[in-house]
């Protein structure tokens, strides 16, 4: 019989079903409100106040899944989108923004719908109107917003973006076009330290709110064997970012462009795109290599079979969960630890949110099917 008891306050340590004293309730799941804390289990050392976390605490903590904006292409975090002037970056930004706001697939990639803010800082509203109407006709979406002016990072850009997020809590993507428009002006603006600092500040913001910041930037004029060495400025920009896209053409007049993609938590890709000059959109022509996928995990497959759109939730103890999982033979505390470290994949591949809590009665886990189409 399915146990659908209501879960209580979230909790911290891992183990089997042992009962805990009623005087103490711990939590081991990071919620949306404290995404800015990278390691919830971190504790201050008595020596110099260094925040540390043990490997045990690391494994015993459930971290929020890194949500995709566009599957296998763009995730929450801070990314650079780099290309030569007039290569077609702004058309791509408009196309991406529209698809995310509408929830429409981008070529063969699934898109997760949400509000989009596009800071088109090198444009005016009249030009935006002409460009978008040429790309998409007059079919509009109410959750795609534009601004043509914004403060710099040092003068309060983060407060402006925070205000927008408060008004639109379902924001998934913010595009800054271009980086030069929001960076400080100074003699050392191209030093490694200043480049690293500005992207780090943007990344801190995107991590705090669990959104994607996509920052448009230019390539340098000199050629390089590695396309990512063509990013204008120093390696500090790429070093601090979660990933980068490099768009380049062999000749400026070509319709075809290569889009090289790298990221911390995603496979490298090289896409071939062709620009449709009539509609001013980029069309997918092919990828250099097939995306490598992790092989199926028997444990996650078994968990996924438990939940259906008709019965999208289950909660109970780890021991009760083991009884429901056919073909899984491990100890209860090992089960929770394996699910802890697989929470991101369980959510992104199967659409299942996993929570692990310690209550007065003992360990309790909760599984919720949030997206049956994952």
Where are the model-predicted features located?
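Core recognition of P-loop NTPase motor domains used across DNA-transaction enzymes
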Residues: 2-75, 87, 130, 138-141, ...
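Conserved inter-motif catalytic segment of the P-loop NTP-binding fold
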Residues: 46, 56, 64-65, 69-70, ...
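Pre-Walker A (Motif I) flank of P-loop NTPase domains
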Residues: 75-79, 114
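Phosphate-binding/switch region of NTP-binding enzymes
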Residues: 80-82, 86, 90-91, 119, ...
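Hydrophobic positions on the alpha1 helix immediately C-terminal to the Walker A/P-loop
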Residues: 92, 96
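Post-Walker A helix-loop "phosphate-sensing" segment adjacent to the P-loop in P-loop NTPases
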Residues: 99-113, 347
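Helix C-cap/helix->beta junction micro-motif
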Residues: 168, 205-209, 350
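DNA transaction DNA-binding modules
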Residues: 272-374
